[in-house]
Amino acid sequence: MNSGFTHITVLLEEAVEALEVRADGCYLDGTFGRGGHSRLILSQLGPDGRLLGFDKDPQAIATGQALAAEDGRFVIVQRSFAELGSEAQERGLAGKVSGILLDLGVSSPQLDDPERGFSFMNDGPLDMRMDPTRGVSAAEFIATAPAEEIARVFKEYGEERFAKRMANAVVARREVQPFERTADLAEVLKVANPAWEKGKNPATRAFQGLRIHVNNELGDLEAGLEAALDALEVGGRLVVISFHSLEDRIVKLFMRKLAKGEADNMPRNLPIQFKPFEPKIKIHGKAQFASDTETKANPRSRSAVMRVAEKLR
């Protein structure tokens, strides 16, 4: 399926290089998207290598199925990467995966297609679901949630300073007419925001908060990181690309905690040696960002942060 909207894969070479792909390895692409990372991984796998892709988006699944028809080493499943643990168990891969890649957030085709309802830039139905067949849409949430809950979503997930004021404006307006279109909601948020940031649409943060809530993005990330650690073999690599501070904070803290071991809250110099207190992962290098060349070619890569870890036990 060709949606007509293109996607430029961020940190393509860097992410796949960080995986240290082995020709006979088994790899998981937790966020297939349009397959940029997956295709490069496949190009480095030998005949015995395997790649399993995950995505919730129906258009991504269609693209993945076409790739699977061309290459028998690749399989794609329509599941969140939060469920990669159970998928690995079902396929007998638990503790046997050589590397896992998570490229977080929303893809360019999702943002650019007005019918998906992710963007305030182009009017479309107020949906925002990565899988439009499951869960509650943004319109349904906005129509039923109390002002306090809407404000929490704007503030907690969108880091919006004027969350309460904007939520009250949304509730006041929905009592007159329900929200069905992205442009309609964006206009109400724009009017309710008293301090516009230079170069940024005043609805940006609220829309981010809604999208994260509707898709349970942070909850999925936390579950996916834990599942990834269990699925990896010793020496396996976990590569995560995030696009905003909330995601990156979760990834950074997860990796730091496991790299230090689990004895952070225990008294020092205890006369015991206990395996669970030893580090579970090794962090490789510092956070990596897109190059100047990449950010000029693809401005959406400016906020990308990549972190890499290796499983020790």
From Swiss-Prot:
Keywords from the named record: Cytoplasm, Methyltransferase, rRNA processing, S-adenosyl-L-methionine, Transferase
Top-level taxon of the source organism: Bacteria
Major localization listed first in the record, in broad terms: cytoplasm
Catalyzed reactions: cytidine(1402) in 16S rRNA + S-adenosyl-L-methionine = N(4)-methylcytidine(1402) in 16S rRNA + S-adenosyl-L-homocysteine + H(+)
Enzyme class: transferase
A GO cellular component annotation in the UniProt record: cytoplasm
Any one GO BP annotation for this protein: rRNA base methylation
HAMAP family: 16SrRNA_methyltr_H
Similarity comment: family membership: Belongs to the methyltransferase superfamily. RsmH family.
Entry function: Specifically methylates the N4 position of cytidine in position 1402 (C1402) of 16S rRNA.
Name under which the protein is recorded: Ribosomal RNA small subunit methyltransferase H
